[in-house]
Amino acid sequence: MRIGLLTEAGYPYVSGDARLWCDRLVHGLAQHEFDVYALSRSQSQEDEGWVPLPPNVRRVRTAPLWFAEDDEVVLGRRSRRRFGECFAELAAVLCGAAGTMGAPESASTSEADRFANALYGLAELARETGGLVGALRSEAAVRTLERACRAPGAQRAAREARVPDLLAVAGYLERALRPLSLDWYEDDGLGAVDLCHAASGGAAVLPGLLARHFTGVPLLVTEYGVRLRTHYLTTPDAPPAVRSLLAAFQGRLAAEAYRQAEVVTAGNAHARRWQERCGADREKLRTVHPGMDARPFAEAGESPECADPDTLVWVGRVEPAKDLVSLLHAFAEIRKQRPKTRLRVVGAPVGPEGAAYLLHCRALAAQLFPDEAEGPHIPGDNPVSFEEIGGPELPRPADAYAAGAVTVLSSVVEGFPISLVEAMLSGRATVSTDVGAVVEVIGGTGLVVPPRNPRALAEACVALLRDPARRARLGAAARARALELFTVEQNIEAFHGIYLEIVSRAPVRRVLDGAGDPLPFAVPAEAQVPFRWSAPSPSLATRNGPGWATARPVRATSHVPAPEGAR
């Protein structure tokens, strides 16, 4: 079959989000053809180029979300009126929907229908006129948004929006709705695929929704991170009006995608709960765990005895959400009971905030653990080391996990813990905080403690450091669990089955091929019966009965006219 793979800031770009699993999916399903429709996020991402594409990728079409030239489309009076009506309806839903995730079901359904009608109305207008880039950037759009914010019934945060807030929201909506103006939805584009697979939420689902609306192509939505949750986590400093209105848009778009999709997949139960909260039908939901290549970790997983029994390892991106401060304080408690224990922090900072956090952690480690020397002529050595993968000591991620007997995860916010799965594939016992999908991933093969609790973290680490046999049992069980649930093979097989399920239930009805010739078996044969099943004729109903039973009934008495006085 032919799959339309829809991505935002992802595959096939080298620095794309979720690039790795999309690349593995395309390579693993070589029996299918893929048409990739990619939305880029920046000029630098486009300049970095694409990853090598396999032969089953037939074509790639791209469009930028970070830049859009004015389409120079001048709307006529009737088109301007239609745009104003649709955009006003969209804005009214957002201003009334902000913060109403707990609204009654009937009200929520009504608002969802209003959002869908406005969205598809804008899409149809863009298709007829050639684009809405100029209209969405216009002063009229900002004024329409302002009227919706000031209208009776608008949420408090929307009513408090000021001019800078309105401009920020209008600019975001213009960028988010740019897929409406693309020419991807004709019969030679997404209309020619058998299935659209959106690799994330947000803008990536819009082409899939429009392909379904215009041509009836079924839609599959995959989310390893729910976009609404990401919005809440990444915009804590935004003005309340901006944060509320953008959250309303993300929530409404997600709800419409879940409603129209044939199947919605989540990477873990944590993301699945968010999807249900945003309106996804539980019958449509599937959990497909991310697939990871187990081969690089095979050597470490098959030789756990090579690890240093007195070394703890932390691996990940250095940022405040990882809570390395609590880990360092927990390590101070561990050193009181196990003075020879060492901690290796392996990871690179993420952005300026991560770099500043790394400097803070280095300073805290130097304060908690002054360099210790075994003798007057031996240089001091700090029990905490900060390293990065790619150096001479740790050239590969597997080398980092192989260096220690216990792997620690100290996060306060976590989605799907990739580093935890890598530690499990390496056959290492783990101590983790109870956040995100940690419990779902770890099962009963590791120790789990509350977040922001250095004492509990220290006690769990000490318990494993003191018991080599327990470490070995947990490590072996963790590796077996990871090989069963989190490999590339299971991920590819799961999506292959979902593809077949969707196409069997919702096939695209095409009766002509590309050359205009009839397609064999495009329409199933239909049986024609010579009578109605629901209302059998009397002769059929009494075929085995007496002949007189089929005659018309005879009146007992003839009709007698009423006398003149009775009329």
Spans of model-derived segments:
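Nucleotide-activated donor-binding/catalytic signature segment of Leloir-type glycosyltransferases, i.e.
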Residues: 358-392
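Conserved acidic donor-binding segment of nucleotide-sugar-dependent glycosyltransferases
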Residues: 447-454, 463-469
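A short, well-ordered alpha-helix in the C-terminal region of glycosyltransferases
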Residues: 456, 470-485, 491-501, 511-514
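Short hydrophobic beta-strand element within catalytic cores of glycosyltransferases
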Residues: 429-432
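Aromatic "clamp/platform" in nucleotide-sugar-dependent glycosyltransferases that forms part
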Residues: 412
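Conserved donor-binding/catalytic core segment of Leloir-type glycosyltransferases
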Residues: 301-335, 342-349
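Donor nucleotide-sugar binding/catalytic pocket of nucleotide-sugar-dependent glycosyltransferases
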Residues: 146-179, 244-299, 306
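Short acidic/histidine- and often glycine-rich active-site loop of Leloir-type glycosyltransferases
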Residues: 435-448
